[in-house]
A protein has these predicted regions:
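Beta-strand-rich recognition domains
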Residues: 1-117
Length: 117
């Protein structure tokens, strides 16, 4: 059976942690669950103290990050282990922690996966 790459858009616009930190999205039944996937996203953070950030897919931690104060907008990609992404409904969630003020939002969240055709 041949394999092709495809993707699912989790969110296109900005998703602010304070108002929405969990997003459900669909993956077709043709996904090859034994293959790794790639998660890509824009991250904007404005913080006054060290901030820790965690992203999860289906409850499993897939990315963590920490940095000092400042305001930044960056794009990240992360390879996701095999078996984390599943056919049907999947859940993307994120949270952050800091000792002081922080503003965190993500956009253009996309996951690339392999499908059997």
């Amino acid at each position: 059976m041949a394999r092709v790459a495809d993707y699912s858009i989790i969110a296109d616009g900005w998703v602010v942690e304070a108002s929405q930190d969990t997003i459900s999205f669909e993956v077709p039944s043709t996904i090859d669950a034994g293959s790794r996937s790639v998660l890509g996203f824009m991250l904007q953070v404005n913080n006054l103290d060290d901030t820790n950030m965690t992203l999860r897919l289906n409850g499993q931690k897939v990315w963590t990050w920490q940095y000092s104060e400042g305001k930044r907008i960056m794009f990240f990609q992360e390879v996701i282990g095999a078996g984390i992404l599943k056919p049907g409904t999947n859940v993307f969630s994120f949270d952050s922690s800091s000792g002081d003020f922080r503003f965190v939002q993500l956009s253009d969240i996309v996951v690339w996966w392999q499908a059997n055709v």
